[in-house]
């Protein structure tokens, strides 16, 4: 039984007699063999072979007795069991140091003969240093005889055959896997082609879509740019006018100050004689001057904070301006819809005009606020300039006082006037701060007004949508009435007795039905509207509808509409239950003809445009609710002539048969 401890290539330095040293890589194997015949013992086998030369073979078998003699000869400090590991450590150090220019450990194979043939050789492990080469271990290796070489070659051949078999098996597996991968590759190529085609079509669609969106966005950006340029030019003109006014005021102020300066110089020359007497007062004046300087510094700080606040307010006003511009754009978009119904619904136009006026008023107020804020900032700048000028005047006066050391009574009065001016400027600054606070409150109020206008716009949008739905429903009812009238005129009419007709009509109302003023409730918009005669009589009296009077066959069907508004939470059941409505007959002579829409308004026009944006307060009871009844309805004697179509607004409700 053998245990392989080490088996790898090691760098080796070969030395032969009368030959140059050469470096080769030799495969070294270290095995620990256990022999139990006749006595159990362990032997250490060291073997050197060359992969390029199969006949190169050196062996060394070290038993425990041999190791003891070796230990005694070379002064080793390890036991037989620890010797293999220490020897392997030395070999690893030799391989690690081999790549260096000056290796610390060397592995040498020294032969006393000229050629490594059948002569023994010594394997030395040498440590090099600048002083001496120390040999840590020297082992004598014997060359292998023919039997050992044949045995070694047979083992190598056996290993190579086993390796060949394993490689053949791995080759077969690799070929199978290659075939499978080729098949999968072909399938994946097909899938890839499909995906490429789909991706190409998808990318083409996306490019077209994005190009269209890009053109739309470019147009919007150009419109916004033109609008912003106009606003910028207007603001620029206003600022130029304001700056010119400021320059004119400053020039006037400069002329006044120059005149005052001349007057002061004259007074200074007059008061040179009395300056020496006021040296005692000078110290007090200097202390007061320091105090005024501190006050001026505090005023500067407050002024800087006010500038920052003004800048923030300007930003906020700009944001409000952008919001107002967006609202104006939305109002313009809504104008296009309202223009379609301008002829029929004047009240909606008035509401829209009111909203536009409110928006314009808000914009004008914002412009005024911006102008006031700019004027306040200009006033603050003026105050800063005045303070700087006052400081310069004070410095010049102090220099003149130090040079002349005299101050006149008139100069004391001048200082008092300057202090009064400073106090006035402080008061002006306080007033400016209060006005800024007031303007902030006004801006907040304007913002609340803007929010209220936005809410009103949203409510008007919802109202327009509801009115559109109501108008479409009314158009549908008018078309149905026209169809019923045509069918009544074309079909053969029967004239039952008037008593039975009136009884039939009057008996069509059930006392338990949910009828509110003869109007159905529209479930989506919450607006009550009258039921057309065709709808009510088709659902309630499908077989008993007849004309009351046959003396007016050409008068046509007249429908009365009385638009009123109910609660928006009316259910569909109320609509279904309230479909039958009483139609009392008027016996008054003055109201002999039924009041309502004439037959010419019930004709369907091909060029008609559906009305949109019906307001809730469009029709009032005083203008559009009239006393009248339904005219003579000419119905066919055959009930099958009436088409039974489902309602567009009530999909689940079919006409009763």
From Swiss-Prot:
Gene Ontology CC terms, in alphabetical order: centriole; centrosome; cytoplasm; deuterosome; procentriole replication complex
Pfam families with a match to the protein in the record: SAS-6_N, Sas6_CC
Coiled-coil region list: 166-471
Post-translational modification, as annotated: Ubiquitinated by the SCF(FBXW5) E3 ubiquitin-protein ligase complex during S phase, leading to its degradation and preventing centriole reduplication. Ubiquitinated by the anaphase promoting complex/cyclosome (APC/C) E3 ubiquitin-protein ligase complex, leading to its degradation and preventing centriole reduplication.
Superkingdom: Eukaryota
Tagged with keyword Cell cycle: yes
GO biological process: centriole replication; centrosome duplication; positive regulation of centriole replication; positive regulation of G1/S transition of mitotic cell cycle; positive regulation of spindle assembly; regulation of mitotic spindle organization; spermatogenesis
Keywords: Cell cycle, Coiled coil, Cytoplasm, Cytoskeleton, Disease variant, Phosphoprotein, Primary microcephaly, Ubl conjugation
Record-listed Phosphoserine modification sites: 510, 615, 657
Alphabetized CDD domains for the sequence: HD_SAS6_N (cd10142)
Region described as Disordered: spans on this chain: 487-510, 615-657
Comp. bias regions, Polar residues: 492-510, 634-647
Domain PISA: 39-91
Subcellular location: Cytoplasm, Cytoskeleton, Microtubule organizing center, Centrosome; Cytoplasm, Cytoskeleton, Microtubule organizing center, Centrosome, Centriole
Record's comment describing the protein's domains: The 35 nM long coiled-coil domain mediates homodimerization while the globular N-terminus links the dimers at an angle of 40 degrees to form the inner ring.
Subunit structure: Nine homodimers form a cartwheel structure with an internal diameter of 23 nm and radial spokes connecting to the microtubule triplets. Forms a complex with CPAP and STIL. Interacts with FBXW5. Interacts with NUP62 and TUBG1 at the centrosome. Interacts with CENATAC; the interaction increases with CENATAC acetylation. Interacts with FZR1; the interaction is regulated by CENATAC and leads to SASS6 proteasomal degradation.
Involvement in disease: Microcephaly 14, primary, autosomal recessive: A form of microcephaly, a disease defined as a head circumference more than 3 standard deviations below the age, sex and ethnically matched mean. Brain weight is markedly reduced and the cerebral cortex is disproportionately small.
Cited function: Central scaffolding component of the centrioles ensuring their 9-fold symmetry. Required for centrosome biogenesis and duplication: required both for mother-centriole-dependent centriole duplication and deuterosome-dependent centriole amplification in multiciliated cells. Not required for centriole formation in embryonic stem cells but necessary to maintain centriole architecture. Required for the recruitment of STIL to the procentriole and for STIL-mediated centriole amplification. Overexpression results in excess foci-bearing centriolar markers.
Protein name from the UniProt record: Spindle assembly abnormal protein 6 homolog
Organism in which the protein naturally occurs: Homo sapiens
